[in-house]
């Protein structure tokens, strides 16, 4: 044994070939600070080995190294700039020391080698992967960029164009795709990885593979002419500007870093990379995106805990109500290995549901994500039926019929009499209180809400709603089922609109108010999209969701919270609804819709919408972006805070994940609570107070005012 640490060890295999094996105590290998220290000590020990002829990096886990330890990031980002630079330099000295060993080096890669894991393998001369390998640099998704030499070594290994695509998109690549661009040198079967790595190393030691020239290229300036450099970097910058936009600085900073370091040696280029990394690490965007990752991990941990505590796992499920939504839920369940019965009273609805599942699977097939066998397996795991016979023995039923309390109550009561006493019932409802639906049930403890978002296959959030009598066992089983479906379940307590819709409608209230005061709805959309960062502005969102749906939900919210959410006369949404302008579904809403070349709806301005709104609005006036953002966001933020105070949602982390995953709250802002911490509670309260005369939704709670006065934060 040359070296033994807690997370890695070094020992000789044969003939002077040493193996550095990453094998942390947990389920995965991470490059945390402790592992970096061990790696430094291990390389120092190797440097003293007179008999060393070659080094192979391996992993004792299913994955090579999944990346740096992101739980350490926020603490690191808060370090003074000099200390952060010192940490980066020490880390990079380790990878440079691997690269500078006087013997050939090779990485034997299985599973994920991401982020710091990818940068580790780039420090070796050769990279051999098995078919399970996935390689990539996802740092830009966290608002930062590679900091352990990724922007320096990858362009010198696979060329500037390929490297810029890898770094700016943050995608991970399968072994065969990585092989095509030269990121790895060969791909072998998993059971051949070790023997192939040893043989490859023997060939390098024998001089059959020129490891010295490989290494020299990585340490030298990029081989690009002035014209090639100009074309590569200007093209990359243009694409990044179009895709990432101004709110996500990491991809553009990465492009500029690679460009600035193109003519430099390795050591000079690493200094430039460190400067870019630190610049990004100090941004609010990085803290927000890392915060989302950590919140997501928190949600996953809660779901794992629920699965452990559940007395029974869901092996068979049923969906009541087919169509697009029911078909989407059945598909999601079946695609994750949980067979689903899809029951409806209408043959056409069943055909629509199966059609939806088939369409989604065809999309996966065309992208090469599944093969025909997998498609057949998933489709055969969905059983469409007009009768309850196949529903009798399922573990869990998701009711997904029309959003009508009477219809839902009737269906729930009917199916409860058919399923087993320990089977769980869940209602996919967006606004109807769960405790109301539970009133007609004999086993209300086995019932909860399970609110999916449309489209089901794409939206990660599922709201799990606890009714007054819902048992912990029911919640645990439904949370575990949602997680098994690949979703992010957030448990909320029962109230009109639950959490997501309850906080969305104050936002629409703000929209109605702005339009009534003379704002141009298209200008409001533009500000909320381009400046605040929502994927869609409020008018466009209403058109996409359906103005009839929004109108109905708005009435439910007004009844549920009359003191705050009752209407002040006819609203912009009322006007569109009364004119039967329901949005994309019938081609006219706030905008008119035409089909683009792909047959998808494309919005265009429509004078008729403005004419309809004129009687309920003051004369048109321009609002600056600050006034529009304040008018839209203060009602939502205040309602989110109230939901936390009332215990509707348990933690700021769960609230922020629900907002980002369920509503598309701008990820670079991290969610409402991260946003409040970023701008400062005192500053927010002062801003909201300027709008307090607009109504109850604009008035901050006493608790929030108290927190602001005490200088507190939510995280």
Swiss-Prot record:
Reactions mediated catalytically: a (3S)-3-hydroxyacyl-CoA + NAD(+) = a 3-oxoacyl-CoA + NADH + H(+); a (3S)-3-hydroxyacyl-CoA = a (2E)-enoyl-CoA + H2O; a 4-saturated-(3S)-3-hydroxyacyl-CoA = a (3E)-enoyl-CoA + H2O; (3S)-3-hydroxybutanoyl-CoA = (3R)-3-hydroxybutanoyl-CoA
Domain of life: Bacteria
Catalytic residues as annotated in Swiss-Prot or TrEMBL: 451
InterPro entries: 3-OHacyl-CoA_DH_CS, 3-OHacyl-CoA_DH_NAD-bd, 3HC_DH_C, 6-PGluconate_DH-like_C_sf, ClpP/crotonase-like_dom_sf, Enoyl-CoA_hydra/iso, FA_oxidation_alpha_subunit, FadB
SUPFAM superfamilies the UniProt entry points to: 6-phosphogluconate dehydrogenase C-terminal domain-like (SSF48179), ClpP/crotonase (SSF52096), NAD(P)-binding Rossmann-fold domains (SSF51735)
Annotated region described as 3-hydroxyacyl-CoA dehydrogenase, given as residue ranges: 311-715
Entry's EC annotation: 4.2.1.17, 5.1.2.3, 5.3.3.8, 1.1.1.35
Keyword Isomerase part of the UniProt annotation: yes
Annotated positions for site Important for catalytic activity: 119, 139
UniProt-recorded Gene Ontology molecular function terms: 3-hydroxybutyryl-CoA epimerase activity; delta(3)-delta(2)-enoyl-CoA isomerase activity; enoyl-CoA hydratase activity; long-chain-3-hydroxyacyl-CoA dehydrogenase activity; NAD+ binding
Keywords (A to Z) from UniProt: Fatty acid metabolism, Isomerase, Lipid degradation, Lipid metabolism, Lyase, Multifunctional enzyme, NAD, Oxidoreductase
Cellular component terms (Gene Ontology): fatty acid beta-oxidation multienzyme complex
Binding site for substrate: 296, 501, 661
Stated family: In the N-terminal section; belongs to the enoyl-CoA hydratase/isomerase family.
Descriptive protein name: Fatty acid oxidation complex subunit alpha
